[in-house]
Amino acid sequence: MNHDYRTIDLFGLTFNLTNILMITVASVIVLLIAILTTRTLSIRPGKAQNFMEWIVDFVRNIIGSTMDLKTGANFLALGVTLLMYIFVSNMLGLPFSVTVGHELWWKSPTADPAITLTLAVMVVSLTHYYGVKMKGLKEYSKDYLRPVPLMFPMKIIEEFANTLTLGLRLYGNIFAGEILLGLLANLATNFYSNSFFLGLVGTVGAIIPMLAWQAFSLFIGTIQAFIFTMLTMVYMSHKISHDH
């Protein structure tokens, strides 16, 4: 299960080409879905438009549960993008993985902590940006001293904890799913080195657990996309609300 990643050194930095490939694939898929479901908008929507409208309404309800919809409308596009991108990213490595030699080329991008933590840092940074933009730097800074100035160190720790848990929760769930699928796949194929019959028995015996775990991983990937989007809006609400 130990795989290497193809990397390239550029300007003194090391870039993971596998991650770059999978991020690009996920982005292209989300872009294509958005284009195909909105290119022919009409009053009497078809199935594709209904699908996108359902996603938008779903995200709108998420936002409405965390903040005033008038204010939350500013974050609707962010929420839809996050939900779709993370869901697609979670699903990419579910049906299969591609390994060339010892190098892994196809997997879920969210099965890498560098990507999930980057997403977490990005959304938490956005919450700070909008907090300052909508409340002003002076008023926003006072939130870190409420209800008493002694809370300041705790507020700083909370920010780091929120960022880490947001990213590592997503990574842990998706990575664990892919690891178990890989173990089941190895179980199905390793017996072929002994005999074809044992290999066939191993393959048949692993099919049902693999299908069951793939179905469970589909559920987990969907839930994790929802949780990440929901927590993003919760953090955003805390930063822009005048009650915090």
From Swiss-Prot:
The keyword Transmembrane helix applies. F-type ATPases have 2 components, CF(1) - the catalytic core - and CF(0) - the membrane proton channel. CF(1) has five subunits: alpha(3), beta(3), gamma(1), delta(1), epsilon(1). CF(0) has three main subunits: a(1), b(2) and c(9-12). The alpha and beta chains form an alternating ring which encloses part of the gamma chain. CF(1) is attached to CF(0) by a central stalk formed by the gamma and epsilon chains, while a peripheral stalk is formed by the delta and b chains. The chain crosses the membrane at residues 17-37, 75-95, 112-132, 164-184, 196-216, 217-237. One of its GO terms (biological process) is proton motive force-driven plasma membrane ATP synthesis. It comes from the Bacteria. GO terms for molecular function: proton-transporting ATP synthase activity, rotational mechanism. It is a multi-pass membrane protein. Belongs to the ATPase A chain family. It comes from Bacillus velezensis (strain DSM 23117 / BGSC 10A6 / LMG 26770 / FZB42). GO terms for cellular component: plasma membrane; proton-transporting ATP synthase complex. The lineage of its organism: Bacteria, Bacillati, Bacillota, Bacilli, Bacillales. Keywords: ATP synthesis, Cell membrane, CF(0), Hydrogen ion transport, Ion transport, Membrane, Transmembrane, Transmembrane helix, Transport. This is ATP synthase subunit a. It is found in: Cell membrane. InterPro entries: ATP_syn_F0_a_bact/chloroplast (IPR045082), ATP_synth_F0_asu (IPR000568), ATP_synth_F0_asu_AS (IPR023011), F0_ATP_A_sf (IPR035908). Its main location: membrane. Key component of the proton channel; it plays a direct role in the translocation of protons across the membrane.
